[in-house]
Amino acid sequence: MGAQLRVYRRRIRSTKSMAKITRAMELIAATRITKAQRAAEAAAPYAREITRAVSAVAARVSDHPLLTEAENPTRAAVLVITSDKGLAGAYTANAIKEAERLTALLNEQGKEVLTYMVGRKGIGFYKFRERPLADSWEGFTERPSYMHAMEISSALMEKFIQETAEGGVDEIHIVSTEFISMINQRARASRILPLEVEEVDSKVLEAEQGPLPLYEFEPGAEEVLDQLLPKYVTNRIYFALLESAASQHASRRAAMKAATDNAEELVKTLTRQANQARQAEITNEISEIVGGADALAAASAGSE
């Protein structure tokens, strides 16, 4: 019984130690969420304005190669953003699941898929299953910079401009995680090229976004679009990296909070079991003492 009590006490100590670690990781993740949110909020105005500018130019240019749908698209690039580290709940699993759903859909449409991966966890997942990756990046998912987005954008744009027969792609999709709230993040897939220009009533658009800007294009709309579209693609990737970083920290915070709560509950259970074992040990010792006293009393009475 004494050995069992020691086991309980040892488990209580180790569980309390683990709870301290997960609590510290929860607090660190909470701090990083705030920083990641601020970075995303700071990038939002530029993302919004460049999107409006590209939309305005695209409305005047109909035959630009980055806007034109291929008659028979045969190959698509899919950029998947995962994490470099674990202990983030289902963050990476959800992103990979969404990427696999998109890949299956594109395959059904007769398109070959080239997968581009961001994050060690996603890279490890694909390498373990011997799945091919066209390219990969790692080491910056928690704190992405604009330079990282430019590097990724450059690789994808090079493939998009290249002829399909020479190994190029007809479409570029991105799978990232949308930060909705501290407790709600959602993996999503979106196409960034060819750019989809939707016909929207100007009155409806003005009611939603305010007065539309009036642009004059020099030397011409097509030349301006040549400069704007690469920046637009880079910005879309950068914003996706920032949102995914915030989502990753939020998911890690939730996972660490759940781990801390579970550890505290386990400590309560183990403490209760240890107390029961201690009480049983005390009861057993008392029974042995009483039994010994009775035996001595009986022996003394017999000798008399």
Curated annotation (Swiss-Prot):
Keyword Membrane: yes
Alphabetic keyword roster: ATP synthesis, Cell membrane, CF(1), Hydrogen ion transport, Ion transport, Membrane, Transport
NCBIfam families the UniProt entry points to: ATPsyn_F1gamma (TIGR01146), PRK05621.1-2 (NF004145)
Function, as annotated: Produces ATP from ADP in the presence of a proton gradient across the membrane. The gamma chain is believed to be important in regulating ATPase activity and the flow of protons through the CF(0) complex.
Protein name, per record: ATP synthase gamma chain
Description of how the protein assembles with itself and partners: F-type ATPases have 2 components, CF(1) - the catalytic core - and CF(0) - the membrane proton channel. CF(1) has five subunits: alpha(3), beta(3), gamma(1), delta(1), epsilon(1). CF(0) has three main subunits: a, b and c.
Record GO biological process: proton motive force-driven plasma membrane ATP synthesis
Gene3D superfamilies on file: 3.40.1380.10, ATP synthase, gamma subunit, helix hairpin domain (1.10.287.80)
PROSITE patterns the UniProt entry points to: ATPASE_GAMMA
Membrane topology value: Peripheral membrane protein
Localization per Swiss-Prot or TrEMBL: Cell membrane
InterPro entries referenced in this protein's UniProt entry, alphabetically: ATP_synth_F1_ATPase_gsu (IPR035968), ATP_synth_F1_gsu (IPR000131), ATP_synth_F1_gsu_CS (IPR023632)
Similarity annotation: Belongs to the ATPase gamma chain family.
SUPFAM superfamilies named in the record: ATP synthase (F1-ATPase), gamma subunit (SSF52943)
Highest taxon, organism lineage: Bacteria
Single GO MF descriptor: ATP binding
Organism: Thermobifida fusca (strain YX)
One of the record's GO cellular component terms: proton-transporting ATP synthase complex
PANTHER family, per the entry: ATP SYNTHASE GAMMA CHAIN, ATP SYNTHASE SUBUNIT GAMMA, MITOCHONDRIAL
